[in-house]
Each structure stands twice: as structure tokens, then as C-alpha cells.
Amino acid sequence: MNSEASGILKHARNLLDPEQKRSSAIAGGFAWWGRDIRTEAVISSLPDQPPIFRIGSDMWKGFEGSLSDMALLSSILKDSTLSAPARMKTDPTRIGLWVDIPLDQEKGSWMAGFLALVAAQQNAEAARFARIGHAWKADNCNLGSNEGIVPSPYAEIETELLTGLGRRDSLFGKDVGLIAEQMESESLFNVHAGIHGVSAEVNLGSQTALLRFLTKQPHPRLGNGLFCFLTIPLEADPSLAMRMNELGLGLVNPIYGPGSWCVGEVGLTHLSFYPNAIYRDGLSSWVVDWSVQRARWIVDVILGTVLGGTVGTSGGRNLPLYQSLIEIYRGEHATP
């Protein structure tokens, strides 16, 4: 391992240490390069000011799904608020996005270190797993082979900090019962807990959305953890998935948690993954809360619009996206 990688690894270990409750001056940067894509996540601070977690991406058009995922991933810090709205800039060939998140110095420093690593791994180096036309099949995780992946210059960091822990059985497996209980308390129906995880349904009027938490399905690079799927009965179109991501970025009250809308085999699917490296007591409860919030947002998108709700700019709503959702919904459920 070269000296640069060794230094980053040492710093990342400190950030991932759950016993580290306070840090008055966090400084570190992580960058990965993949195929036509570069992603950076930087943690920095100034004296007497709270640390800032800055996550940014600059890439060729065609990887917009990963771009949106970066901002969604950055919002995982539940106790943080965006210091400014997600800012997107465009030109004829490139797209960029940066999000700054102030970190509570009493909480979350280990989370920030994890994010800096996983943001790069899940979105940059593994760009072919982006949610637009690649091998990603959300509903059965048929992620294909590793053909075409560019090795990370910091592969040893990934191996030690993330993949190593991923070789263990899912640490989230012990929370399956708690996840099921929380889903029942959220008034979801047909809640079922089994050896592979938990599933439940969300009422969408004449149809339902399916919410699943799987602990037996490993990530192809990060190993075991917790996969979360929210599948809705809309056409699984990559452009619609991208617009769903854009709408999510524009919400005045953001929905926390990493992930991205993608193409599933039975419908449009929001997919997120939490590897063993991030596991802490209580995290599963947060994950359920974020997922239920997203499901209720979908109810508002589909039912609130299709069944007579108003459409406007409140809450970051985007009229063209809502119109496309209405058209697809009506087409899928038209009476013969």
C-alpha cells in the first residue's frame, strides 16, 4: 500500500471508530475515478466552526443516475440539515453537483467517514451499476459479472474497511423482528418476516407498492448488509427513474437515506444498500423510517395527483414529472 493510501486508511479508521464522539477538526478527502466519471467526497472544518461534509460529482452526461444518487447518499446524516439546496450546473457536455452538510460534532463523525468511502465505491468506480441501462436488475439483484469495472486505486482501503466486514453474515439480520414490528406500527399491511428479511405493502388505491428489506442478498462488491427495495406499479423507464431522482433532490423537506430510483423487472424501484460496515444499534429503525417516508411520498405523488390533489411547486413538486406519472399511471390501470 502506498503512503497516500495508508494515510487515508488511517484517517478513515478513525472516522469509522464508533467510540469517537467528538472531533473539533476533521480533515480528509477521498476521490475515486472510474470509466468517464470522477466523484469526490471531502470532510473539512475550520477552527470554531462545525465540520462540513461536502460531496460532489462531475461526470459525462449519461451517468446522471449516479449524480443524483450522490446527493441522495449525502442526506443519510439524519441529524444534519443541508446548508444550501443541492446545486446543479450544466454545460453541453458535463454535469456537476455539490452538496454541503454541516456535521453535528457530537454525532455522526464515523458516518461521515463511511460516506466518503461508499459514495465513491457505489457511485464512481461501480458506475456500470448506475441505474440507467446497465446490468442492474433491481428486483432480483442480477448484477452481472465484474467485467469492465476499473480497479480502484484505493482497493485495499475498500477491502479492509468495507468488503472485509461484508464477508460476515449480515449484521442487520438480528434486527428483522424489530423491522417487522416497526413496519406494523407504521400501518403498513401484509407485513411478513422470514429468513431472508421483511416485506410489506403500501396502499396506492387500486394497487399497492411493495417495500422489502433483504438481509441474505450480498452486494457484489461490499458484501453482506441490508438491501432496501420500494417497488411501485409504474413503467420501469430509465428516464422516469432519473426524473424521480431529480424530484427527490428538489424536495423542501428531503427524504433521508442513500439510494436511487432504477429500473426493476416488475416496476419502478427505489434501491438502497447499507453494508455491514455502517451497522450500529438503532440504524435499522432509521432505515425503516426513511423507507416509510419515501413510500408515503409516493402515495402523495400518485394518489394526491391522480385522484384529485393539487399540483404545484409546494414541497419541491415538479409539474412535468407529475404529468408523466399521471399518464403512466392511467395507462397502466386503464379500464378495458
Where is each model-derived feature located?
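Hydrophobic, helix-prone linear segments
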Residues: M1-S68, S75-T81, G282-W290, R294-P336
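Charge-rich, low-complexity N-terminal segments
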Residues: M1-V42, K78-R94, Q105-A112, A127-K216, ...
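Hydrophobic-cavity lipid-handling domains and compact docking modules
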Residues: A27-F63, H196-P238, R243
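Short, surface-exposed, charge-dense and proline/glycine-enriched linear segments
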Residues: P51-W60, A116-A126, T163-D169, P220-T231, ...
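Short, internal acidic amphipathic alpha-helical interface segments
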Residues: R54-W98, G223-P275
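Intrinsically disordered, low-complexity coil segments
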Residues: F63-D69, Q105-F114, P218-G223
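Well-ordered alpha/beta subsegment
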Residues: A84-A120, A124-A138, Y256-Q293, W297-V311, ...
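Unusually extended, aromatic-enriched hydrophobic runs near protein termini
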Residues: C141-E156, G248-N253, G312-E327
